[in-house]
C-alpha cells in the first residue's frame, strides 16, 4: 500500500466494512455529499441517502453471494494539500466462484480537510452489472 497514514487507516476500516457488507459503517468514510461515477454515468448522493439504502445494498450483495472483499493494492496520488486520488484494486469472492477472486478497480477522490479524510467521489472502472452477469451471479 502506497498511501499516507490517514488514508491507509481509512481504507483498512473501509475494507472491513465492505467485506462484512456493513454499508452503514461504510457510510462514515464518505463526505456528507459525494459523487458516484462509472461506465454508465454519474449521480450525486448524500450520506443520508446512503444510510437509508444501506440494508437494501447489503441485501443485494448477499443475494449475489458475496463472501469477502479485500484490497489487493492501493495507490495514493496527491492532487493538492487537501485532496488526493486513491486507486484501489479490489478482490471479491462469491459463493458461485469459490475462492477465485473477482478483481476490479475503483478510484476515490479524497478530501483531507478536518480530522479524517473523506471520500467525495468514487469512480467504478468496470460495469458492475455486466461483470456480475458474465459470472452468472444475476438472475435473468
Task: Please place each PLM-identified region on the residue numbering.
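A solvent-exposed, acidic/Ser-Thr-rich amphipathic alpha-helical stretch
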Residues: 23-76, 82
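Structural motif
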Residues: 30, 79-80, 96, 113
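Short, cysteine-centered beta-strand-loop-beta hairpins and adjacent loop/turn segments enriched
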Residues: 92-102
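Hydrophobic/aromatic beta-strand elements that line small-molecule binding cavities or substrate pockets
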Residues: 71-77, 90-92, 105-111
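Generic short beta-strand segments
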Residues: 33-35, 87-93
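Short beta-strand edge/turn micro-motifs at domain boundaries
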Residues: 103-137
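Short hydrophobic/aromatic-rich beta-strand segments that constitute the beta-sheet cores
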Residues: 36-37, 86, 119-121
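Short, low-complexity N-terminal intrinsically disordered segments enriched in polar/charged residues
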Residues: 1-32, 48, 137-140
Amino acid at each position: 500500500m502506497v498511501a499516507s497514514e490517514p488514508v491507509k487507516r481509512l481504507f483498512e476500516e473501509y475494507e472491513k466494512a465492505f467485506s462484512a457488507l456493513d454499508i452503514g459503517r461504510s457510510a462514515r468514510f464518505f463526505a456528507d455529499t459525494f459523487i458516484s461515477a462509472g461506465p454508465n454515468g454519474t449521480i450525486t448522493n448524500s450520506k443520508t441517502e446512503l444510510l437509508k439504502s444501506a440494508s437494501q445494498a447489503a441485501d443485494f450483495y448477499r443475494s449475489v453471494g458475496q463472501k469477502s472483499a479485500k484490497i489487493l493494492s492501493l495507490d495514493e496520488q496527491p492532487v493538492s494539500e487537501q485532496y488526493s486520488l486513491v486507486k484501489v484494486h479490489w478482490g471479491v469472492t462469491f459463493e458461485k466462484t469459490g475462492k477465485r477472486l473477482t478483481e476490479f478497480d475503483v478510484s476515490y477522490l479524497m478530501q483531507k480537510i478536518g480530522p479524517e479524510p473523506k471520500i467525495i467521489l468514487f469512480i467504478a472502472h468496470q460495469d458492475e452489472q455486466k461483470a456480475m452477469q458474465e459470472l452468472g451471479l444475476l438472475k435473468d
